[in-house]
Design a protein with these regions (language model features):
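Glycine/serine-rich loop-strand microenvironments at binding/catalytic pocket rims
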Residues: 1-9, 133, 145
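Active-site catalytic pocket residues across diverse enzymes, especially alpha/beta-hydrolases
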Residues: 23-27, 85
Length: 212
């Protein structure tokens, strides 16, 4: 029997603590793995009495049995704070609470799937993607790396989502729509046409949006 893993959560603020709660509800908790602590370098963030902050994710040296989960919402932050750990060949946890995964669908290393996410057949989910509760990913959808998809999002069949994309809650991506790298989809938007890389869209139908 292999030794249990020691889970380290990157990010000790609100979402990190939500991830801690989800991990503790998992049936494998304290059987296959335990919780070692948080990694966080923000001076105003404190650990919990039973879950300390172990150090800075940019300088932490991996110890035997460590396995990591990235609880940072921003794709840019997720890239930044996983990079030094990936350079050390860190192992990353896949959290999949009540995930419904279709035939031939694939999911990448370090993904987080909140409660009741549904991924249909032949979908491909890249590394370090976060998909929050009750979102539906249609058949053949391709999602790149480090994306963040909010609650109650629907991605229609064969849509293509680039890397580092943020899709806010209750958005709908119509079938076969392509969304470029780094695009942002506003809450409640209905995306009926392709979205270029780095563009923010909002509304129904979704149109280019700029903060003034």
């Amino acid at each position: 029997m292999s030794a249990p893993k020691h889970v380290i959560i990157i990010g000790a603020s609100g979402y990190g603590r939500s991830i801690l709660w989800m991990l503790r509800e998992d049936s494998a908790y304290q059987k296959d793995w335990d919780i070692k602590g948080f990694l966080d370098n923000r001076a105003d963030i404190e650990g919990l009495p039973d879950v300390p902050i172990l150090g800075d994710p940019l300088s932490y040296k991996i110890e035997p049995g460590d396995i990591f989960i990235n609880a940072l919402g921003s794709p840019a932050d997720r890239r930044t704070y996983t990079a030094p750990l990936r350079e050390q060949d860190a192992d990353f946890f896949i959290l999949r609470k009540n995930l419904r995964l279709g035939e031939r669908a694939t999911i990448g290393l370090g993904c987080i799937f909140d409660d009741n996410v549904s991924i249909s057949v032949d979908a491909q989910i890249g590394r370090f993607v976060t998909i929050l509760g009750s979102s539906i990913i249609g058949h053949g959808v391709k999602i790149g790396e480090f994306c963040h998809i909010g609650n109650f999002v629907f991605c229609g069949g064969d849509a293509v989502i680039g890397n580092d994309v943020v899709i806010h809650p209750h958005a709908t991506i119509l079938p076969r729509v392509k969304i470029g790298d780094g695009a942002i989809i506003g809450a409640g938007s209905v995306v009926v046409a392709n979205v270029p890389a780095g563009v923010t869209v909002f509304g129904n139908p979704a149109k280019r949006f700029e903060f003034k």
